[in-house]
Amino acid sequence: MASLRHRVRAIALQILFELDATDHPPDQVVGRRLEEEQLPPEGERFLRRLVFGAWEHAAHLDRIIEEAAPNWPVSQMPGVDKAILRIALFEALIDKEEKTPLKAIINEAVELAKQYGSDNSSRFVNGVLGTVVSRYRERSKG
């Protein structure tokens, strides 16, 4: 059985995909999904942090994605891949509450890409995240 955090990331992916494809208000979409999913309090908190964090920082995260994948404009990227990358990059670079190891964040993102994306999604997501992590490490050394 999938862990609570994996399940929450999958729900966050679905919510971000919906938000990106529609003009539905984020509060309403999250509220509806929380009613449907019946998550424990820690899962609900994690879901809200992932969704609202990735959504609020989307423009910044999209610039990071485009730097790492210049041949793939975010506007033309499959919605599932974009949502997965936004979640993973939010967790890795912005979220200060969780201390999830980078390797775990990348592994979770790749698993979500295998589960919800196209045949090439997992390689693409892994490549983008690997590029971002190596650039981030280079900048922090300099």
Curated annotation (Swiss-Prot):
Pfam families linked: NusB (PF01029)
Signal peptide: none
GO cellular component: cytosol
Family annotation (SUPFAM superfamilies): NusB-like
Family: Belongs to the NusB family.
Its job: Involved in transcription antitermination. Required for transcription of ribosomal RNA (rRNA) genes. Binds specifically to the boxA antiterminator sequence of the ribosomal RNA (rrn) operons.
HAMAP family (UniProt xref): NusB
Stored NCBIfam families: nusB
Protein name according to UniProt: Transcription antitermination protein NusB
Provenance organism: Roseiflexus castenholzii (strain DSM 13941 / HLO8)
